[in-house]
Amino acid sequence: MSNKLKGKSLRKALTLAYSILLVGSSGLAVLDTLFISKSYTKFSNETTTTSQSTSSSGTSTATVNTATAYEDDTKVIAIETYERNSTQIHVAIVTIKGDASIKTALADETYGRNVKAKTSTTAQSVNAVLAVNGDYYGARDAGYVIRNGQLLRSDSQDANQEDLVIYQDGSFEIIREGDITAQELLNKGAVQVLTFGPALIENSQVAVDSTDEVGKAMASNPRTAIGVIDDKHYVLVVSDGRTDE
């Protein structure tokens, strides 16, 4: 599957982190979690940009709605499950229509340290039809955080830290925090910035080697990845881990 990706794909562990959802009316959204919580500020699930955007408060009527497929006037989703090395792998192919876009949502609508909520709970709160975890922002004190056009944290984690930037038009870019500031990304039109990595595929080429990735994959942790295939055509991958099921 990775050889078919024309865009970029980022990989990150799922451990009680941050989630990406497909909202019932407009697009994708994302969540956060972890252990001892500390609230910094309340967070709006609405997108804040200088350009036109589709609000998550709208409504859509599903024309297809099954356990493995969904379609309405803003999105089409197809889900398949595979088993490799005794691990369940879930793959969602998502096509977003019109002005709908990827969106994010924080646990308890709160930006803070280790604010915790189940992915399913946050997904339900924003009327999501598809949800996966995302980055580790709440477990760290640094690393860019932009959610729905709001700049929440501008401190760089590391000059070589790779982030996924999602723009209003749905395009992806992988940046290193040492090359650009969070404010500059916001000025360029970034709507979401997710701090994880490493980048797995860039421009149809594998972008990691054993020194980047293999060591991190040795533990039995859940993993998730998001990639862009072409314009507003995405793949989301989740592998199970740390479970007896």
Kindly label every feature range from the protein language model.
Residues 70, 132-212, 217:
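Active-site-adjacent helix-turn-beta-strand microarchitecture at beta-sheet edges
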Residues 2-157, 161-163, 173-174:
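Zymogen propeptides
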Residues 107-111, 178-182, 239-243:
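Short, solvent-exposed aromatic-acidic interface loops
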Residues 95-98, 166-172, 203, 228-232:
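Short acidic-glycine loop/turn motifs at beta-strand connectors
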Residues 112-116, 183-189, 219-220, 245:
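A short, polar/proline- and glycine-enriched secondary-structure boundary/capping micro-motif
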Residues 193, 201, 205-245:
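Domain-core and long-helix interface of multi-subunit machines
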Residues 129-133, 165, 227, 235-237:
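Structural recognition of the beta-strand scaffold that forms the well-ordered cores
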Residues 127, 160-161, 168-169, 195-196, ...:
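Short coil/turn connectors at secondary-structure junctions
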